């Protein structure tokens, strides 16, 4: 599975971006919240990803934070909600707004998202209740390759996105990968 993509931002056409990685351009679909926070064309970009393989397509979805990716993964587990619908939900409202709507059982807020009807909104509320809050408690934007590498290493070691994000948030921004992993593991062991 492809967990992260880093490279030069070659094109931006909502909701799709093209990331050039050593001469190979990868098309990545991103929610609008991530799209608006992307750097300018030609600048370096790093996105956490979710890779979807279907019979007729292979699609890479990109996210600016581990929290956003975790919410996407929770959404696509719901019957009747595919990756495109999940992307639409995350484009129409922030992860925090979604978590709030789920906590307060506000279907009306979710129905405002294009492509989401009353039944789908109610199913989202029912199936996300108690699940979404655990992953949404902390949002960490990955601002450097070393932070992204630390986050990926912690997730690969079996820690949840939330626990890895909490550990990463406590680290100094300019820490190296190996030192960062060691400190994060010590913090997680407590």
From Swiss-Prot:
What's the protein here called?
Answer: Holliday junction branch migration complex subunit RuvA
Keyword DNA repair present in the record's keywords: the answer is yes
List the GO molecular function terms: ATP binding; four-way junction DNA binding; four-way junction helicase activity
Q: Which NCBIfam families match?
A: ruvA
Q: Which GO terms describe its cellular component?
A: cytoplasm; Holliday junction helicase complex; Holliday junction resolvase complex
Localisation per UniProt entry: Cytoplasm
Species name for this entry? Answer: Polaromonas sp. (strain JS666 / ATCC BAA-500)
Positions of the UniProt region annotated as Domain II = 65-137
UniProt entry keywords in alphabetical sequence? Cytoplasm, DNA damage, DNA recombination, DNA repair, DNA-binding
Q: Which gene encodes it?
A: ruvA
- Purpose of the protein: The RuvA-RuvB-RuvC complex processes Holliday junction (HJ) DNA during genetic recombination and DNA repair, while the RuvA-RuvB complex plays an important role in the rescue of blocked DNA replication forks via replication fork reversal (RFR). RuvA specifically binds to HJ cruciform DNA, conferring on it an open structure. The RuvB hexamer acts as an ATP-dependent pump, pulling dsDNA into and through the RuvAB complex. HJ branch migration allows RuvC to scan DNA until it finds its consensus sequence, where it cleaves and resolves the cruciform DNA.
């Amino acid at each position: 599975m492809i967990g992260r993509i880093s490279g030069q931002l070659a094109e931006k056409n909502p909701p799709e971006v093209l990331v050039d990685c050593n001469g190979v351009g990868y098309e990545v679909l991103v929610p609008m919240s991530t799209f608006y926070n992307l750097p300018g064309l030609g600048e370096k970009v790093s996105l956490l990803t979710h890779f979807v393989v279907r019979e007729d397509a292979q699609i890479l979805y990109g996210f600016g934070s581990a929290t956003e990716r975790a919410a996407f993964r929770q959404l696509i587990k719901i019957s009747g909600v595919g990756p495109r619908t999940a992307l639409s939900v995350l484009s129409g409202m922030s992860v925090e707004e979604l978590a709030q709507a789920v906590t307060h059982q506000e279907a009306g807020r979710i129905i405002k998202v294009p492509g989401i009807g009353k039944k789908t909104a109610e199913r989202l509320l029912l199936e996300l209740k108690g699940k979404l809050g655990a992953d949404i408690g902390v949002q960490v934007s990955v601002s450097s390759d070393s932070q992204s590498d630390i986050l990926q290493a912690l997730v690969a070691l079996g820690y949840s996105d939330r626990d890895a994000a909490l550990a990463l948030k406590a680290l100094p921004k300019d820490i190296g990968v190996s030192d960062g992993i060691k400190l994060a593991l010590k913090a997680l062991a407590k």
